[in-house]
Amino acid sequence: MSATPVTQLTPSSQPQQPCLPLLGASVTELTSWVQQQGQPAYRGKQLHDWIYHKGVRSLTDISVFSKQWRAAVADVPIGRSTIHHRSVASDGTVKYLLQLSDGEIVETVGIPTDKRLTVCVSTQVGCPMACDFCATGKGGYKRNLERHEIVDQVLTVQEDFQQRVSHVVFMGMGEPLLNTENVLAALRSLNQDVGIGQRSLTLSTVGIRDRISQLAEHHLQVTLAVSLHAPNQALREQLIPSARSYHIEDLLAECREYVAITGRRISFEYILLAGVNDLPEHALELSKHLRGFQNHVNLIPYNPISEVDYKRPSGDRIQAFLTVLQQQHIAVSVRYSRGLEADAACGQLRTKTSR
């Protein structure tokens, strides 16, 4: 998995401008870049440390560099956002609205649990998938996020909490597999530059044809989470419009191939909607799809939003669905979302400034 080069290495007597902000670049890329500016190679490692571990937001603030060189590269962007809005839920979950260099707003969430700190990152401004139950898709889609804009979300939460981020889930605004190049580059950087283990990184997708198979070719150790949300094609099309062009059987075939190639278990996300997909017969139908390969089901009781009429099932209905899957020997757990008061829970990531 390789990141986009920081700069075209063309000879120049003037400090060269990287084609992308420096955040997201590897130590090798940064070393090549500083050498092109006439600096010794060891400056690349220093620059890497200041960007990823000291939180520098401008090259002019790196005190180990000469004032002359800092002035020469003052306009080279590192690629950090600014916090536009911050809201805190009673459970400690923090939702951030981050303003990017072009003025767009994206959302990220910091989720503290015991000794862990998990960050839920966005991969697009808005989302084109328009899932019927999700708040994010109601605001439309604008563009993909660049690699630095994804990595920045993690550093922002880490700095705000003053605690090392232990886990990152790509479950915020957007469909990651519609932004594969930047997502893969961000995964590389989070692993190798920020220092988060691959198995502590989770990539979520509703399923884009052929993209899961392509992801398998990278032999990553990240966790793949597939948003299934229905046990059959007709119901899935009702909830996820993009499913009309990608049959559930084809999606599951790609998932089986992914497990065979990577040896990694897949997580299936299943939002429980009262009276829609939460009946025992739905659970039984779901179980038949999941036999014969490594997987785990996360049941997610729905978080109601004002724009749609879906409701959260009762506790008894949730337990009944869970019991059927357990009786069918399917690995399953219930995941209750955090941060409800901050509008930060799964499916509620929405840019307030667009309302």
From Swiss-Prot:
Q: Which UniProt keywords apply?
A: 4Fe-4S, Cytoplasm, Disulfide bond, Iron, Iron-sulfur, Metal-binding, Methyltransferase, rRNA processing, S-adenosyl-L-methionine, Transferase, tRNA processing
Q: Name one GO biological process term.
A: rRNA base methylation
**Record's superkingdom?**
Bacteria
Q: Which residues bind S-adenosyl-L-methionine?
A: 174-175, 204, 227-229, 303
Q: Where does [4Fe-4S] cluster bind?
A: 127, 131, 134
Q: Does the keyword 4Fe-4S apply?
A: yes
Q: Where in the cell is it found?
A: Cytoplasm
GO MF annotations, alphabetized:
4 iron, 4 sulfur cluster binding; metal ion binding; rRNA (adenine(2503)-C2-)-methyltransferase activity; rRNA binding; tRNA (adenine(37)-C2)-methyltransferase activity; tRNA binding
A GO CC annotation recorded here is: cytoplasm
Q: What is one Pfam family matched by this protein? A: RlmN_N
Q: What does this protein do?
A: Specifically methylates position 2 of adenine 2503 in 23S rRNA and position 2 of adenine 37 in tRNAs.
Q: What is this protein called?
A: Probable dual-specificity RNA methyltransferase RlmN
Q: Corresponding gene?
A: rlmN
